[in-house]
Amino acid sequence: MDQIRLTHLRQLEAESIHIIREVAAEFSNPVMLYSIGKDSSVMLHLARKAFYPGTLPFPLLHVDTGWKFREMYEFRDRTAKAYGCELLVHKNPEGVAMGINPFIHGSAKHTDIMKTEGLKQALNKYGFDAAFVGARRDEEKSRAKERIYSFRDRFHRWDPKNQRPELWHNYNGQINKGESIRVFPLSNWTEQDIWQYIWLENIDIVPLYLAAERPVLERDGMLMMIDDNRIDLQPGEVIKKRMVRFRTLGCWPLTGAVESNAQTLPEIIEEMLVSTTSERQGRVIDRDQAGSMELKKRQGYF
C-alpha cells in the first residue's frame, strides 16, 4: 500500500515487521533479547505478527541479573507460556559465585558483570549471529546514532565509527565468522508511539507501568521501590507508600519510580504529552559517568 495512505503507527509497524523478517531470512541463528519491558512487549507482538499464523523462528533470550522486579519474572514466564515461545534464561555464573550485588558493588560493576558479560556469554554459548533489541533512538544520545543493523566484532564490541549506510530501507547483513549484529526494529519509534501502539493493539504489559500505591524510599534523588528484603536501609531512610509508576523497568535497586496517578493507558498517553523528561531519568546505570551508555555499548552492552 502507498505509504501516504498508512497511518503513522502502521508505517512504523510495517517497517519493523520488514526488519524482523529480513533478519530471520538473512541470518542463520537469530535471537530476540527479551527484557520484559514495554518495548520488548511491542517487539514480541510485532514478531508474532510477522510470522503469523506460524510460531517464532527464533527463541527469546532473557539475560537475568537476579534483581528484576518479582512482577517482571511472573510476567516473563506467563508470556512465554501463553505464546508458546522458546525462552532461554541466562545468568552469569561467575557473577553469581562472586555474589555481585548492586548495593555493595555499585551499578557500574553490577551492570558490567551481570548484564554485559552475561549477554556475551549467552551469545557465545548458543552461537547467535543476530540479536533483536528493543532499544529506540529517542531514548538516549548514543542510541540515537546507532544504525538499525548495529555491527559487533567477534568480541561483541561496537565501534560507532565503523557503521554501514542504510539507504532506502536496504540493510547489509554481510558479516565474517565470529561477528554478529544487534538489530533494532523499534529504532524510529518514540516513547509516545510505543504507548499509543500498546493501547491500539491491546498489548499486555507489566502492571508496574501503571500507577499504584507502592512502598518506596528516596535515595540519591530517586524513588526506589522496595521489592524484597535485600534492601540495605541507610540511617534516616523511611519506607513510605506513594502513588508511583515506572516509565522504564530494570533491576529494582537501580530503577527509579515516578510519582503519577496514571492508572490506565489513555492516562499514561496523556501524561506523556506534557512530559519534559526522558524515560531513562530513573535509570541509575545511565549516570555512572559521562557517556556511560556509549562506553557500555562499546564493551558489548545491549
Swiss-Prot record:
Pathway: Sulfur metabolism; hydrogen sulfide biosynthesis; sulfite from sulfate: step 1/3. One of its GO terms (biological process) is hydrogen sulfide biosynthetic process. Its EC number is 2.7.7.4. Keywords: ATP-binding, Nucleotide-binding, Nucleotidyltransferase, Transferase. GO terms for molecular function: ATP binding; sulfate adenylyltransferase (ATP) activity. Pfam families: PAPS_reduct. It comes from the Bacteria. SUPFAM superfamilies: Adenine nucleotide alpha hydrolases-like (SSF52402). InterPro entries: PAPS_reduct_dom, Rossmann-like_a/b/a_fold, SO4_adenylTrfase_ssu, Sulfate_adenylyltrnsfr_sub2. It catalyses: sulfate + ATP + H(+) = adenosine 5'-phosphosulfate + diphosphate. The keyword Acyltransferase does not apply. Belongs to the PAPS reductase family. CysD subfamily. NCBIfam families: CysD, PRK05253.1, PRK12563.1. PANTHER family: SULFATE ADENYLYLTRANSFERASE SUBUNIT 2. With CysN forms the ATP sulfurylase (ATPS) that catalyzes the adenylation of sulfate producing adenosine 5'-phosphosulfate (APS) and diphosphate, the first enzymatic step in sulfur assimilation pathway. APS synthesis involves the formation of a high-energy phosphoric-sulfuric acid anhydride bond driven by GTP hydrolysis by CysN coupled to ATP hydrolysis by CysD. This is Sulfate adenylyltransferase subunit 2. It comes from Shigella dysenteriae serotype 1 (strain Sd197).
